[in-house]
Amino acid sequence: MTSETVSPSSFGASPETAVVAALAGRSLALVGMMGAGKSTIGRRLAARLRMRFVDADAEIELAAGMPIPEIFETHGEPHFRDGEARVIARLLNGGPIVLATGGGAVLREETRARLSERAVSIWLKADAEVILRRVRRRADRPLLQTADPAATIKRLIAEREPIYRQADITVASRDVPYEWIVDECIGLLHRRLCRGEMTRNAMKDPDEGFDTTQ
């Protein structure tokens, strides 16, 4: 993914307008763990940017004709991941959108490649304690149907964080008003896309996207 500068006609525009112009037809993709707030923040971010919001999990359920827990139970996780990759590819091909991805979507190489090509990615980074508090009462998380959900969450974070960290922008997901986090997303997008500032790990090349070799 490449840092952008806005055209002179964008000077004086609101940050939201400038970000959409700098996206130049690309989508925004929110990545991160279950319970990080990707759908909640994504809807509000899309409204602020006047872009269409799409929840990948909802689209997967629509395409499969069954809820995600049933897909896992009936067909297994590999089958689910295959369908997830196809749905995300279709959605990104039809962009620009604000896309909330599933927690494990970026585990697939082809999905990481598609996100790097067609989207600017935002990692909503949440601590294990925050995630557990948000999801512990929900029965629609098949990967948490274990004897020790807290240990499962910590294991998944450890496995996935090296990939999440490759996102273009990182925003801490914590228990503050949603609009604060949306404001941070827009501010960081504006700095990265419109002012050419690096907003992720300072050691990382700003032209890099998701590593598709992992």
Swiss-Prot record:
User: What's its EC?
Assistant: 2.7.1.71
Residues binding substrate: 57, 81, 103, 160
Q: Does the keyword Transferase apply?
A: yes
Quote the cellular component terms of the Gene Ontology held in the record.
cytosol
This protein's cofactor list reads: Mg(2+)
Report the cofactor remark.
Binds 1 Mg(2+) ion per subunit.
Subcellular location field:
Cytoplasm
Q: Which HAMAP family match?
A: Shikimate_kinase
Q: What is this protein called?
A: Shikimate kinase
Query: What is the top-level taxon of the source organism?
Result: Bacteria
What the protein does comes down to: Catalyzes the specific phosphorylation of the 3-hydroxyl group of shikimic acid using ATP as a cosubstrate.
